[in-house]
């Protein structure tokens, strides 16, 4: 059972997140030959104030 976990900064629309879920699901199915029912894709949205890169939060960087 393939499990894919994705972390993204909060702020994207539900339709964008659903499109990502579907695209990743399809990529796993097509590349690994996994049955649809066995594929799990989880997106975790992280507050930009709680995610840092290069010593600055994403919020500070304007993302």
Give each language-model segment a name:
Residues 1-63:
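A domain-level signal for the structural core that forms small-molecule/cofactor-binding pockets
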